[in-house]
Amino acid sequence: MPNHVVNHISLQGDPEKIRSMLETIKSDEHGIGSVDFNKIVPMSKSLDIEAGSRTDRGLKVYRDFIDVYTLAGTMNMEKLRNIPVESEEIFLRQRTDIRRDEWELGKAAWRNIRDFGAPTWYDWCISNWGTKWNAYGYSEDTIDYHDGDTLYFQTAWSAPHPILEKLTQMFPDIMLEHEWADEDVGQNCGRYSYQNGERIEEYYPESEAEAVEFACKLWDYDPLDLDLCLNAEGTKYIHLELEEYQQIELLGKPALFTNARLTDADIPQGLYCYHLRHSDDGGRFCSVEPRVGVNHGGSVITKEPIDFGKQGYISFTKDTEPNFTGGEQTLGEFLKSDALQESEVMNLC
């Protein structure tokens, strides 16, 4: 299955001209508010043949035949439109290894290349529509049959930029703004504006955080529903369920531990990151500090800030060293743990 790309189209211009555009491009199945790419850049029915290994094999064989037929040279393409069937049959009698169905597919693909520049629908659609399928993803919620200035649909793998450029050539007085976003949230997203067949404005999110927020807006997602949370620096989103950390008790409160050297870029907003220093012999943790250079013993994540006072660190005794409880939690589970405990207490009450 492909990655789905959501497309939002906003139209600006004379309402009657917009209505005319929507009538021209509508899908016969879905009506006003939908788009049929064939109404904008039509695809020949002869291209609608099987795309895959059988066609590839047949095309290779048919090209071998053309080399033999033209003596590996060139010939006027008009003459190649009327190749005698007898010539093909002579070649096939010599090549008994060829499957007849693959031969016919290859022959059709070769003719499509000659006439349309692509062997099958697949390559033609990628080249002429910018995506491999027609628009899809319609529902009663996304098609507005009354208001006439917004379109919503999905495409496979990529946005249909050639289609929209052609559409604004067909209707030069209408300005079209196109926003798109891949379901791989934060990737393959942006905004183009078109008028009179020309792209007049481009926008791409500048940061990872901006890209995630842009995509979530188009898909109508809450980042938290995708287990994504903005990091403490506000520069990127962190997946809360990808990695597990060791559970510890630190200064009498639950915390998480990892051997890695974390920064605020690695933890979600609402949590705090500190560092453990181990003794010179590496036998025990001797302190927790905001930053540790030498003898770094690991990073800890807490739900509350630690007050280090004037000293700038907190030393451990044998009784106050971090206690490893033996469990593991993701960042998401750690964030939710207090809420779960409160819920359990309420149930007991």
Model-derived features: positions:
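Intrinsic low-complexity, intrinsically disordered or marginally ordered coil/linker segments
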Residues: 1-271, 275-283, 293-301, 309, ...
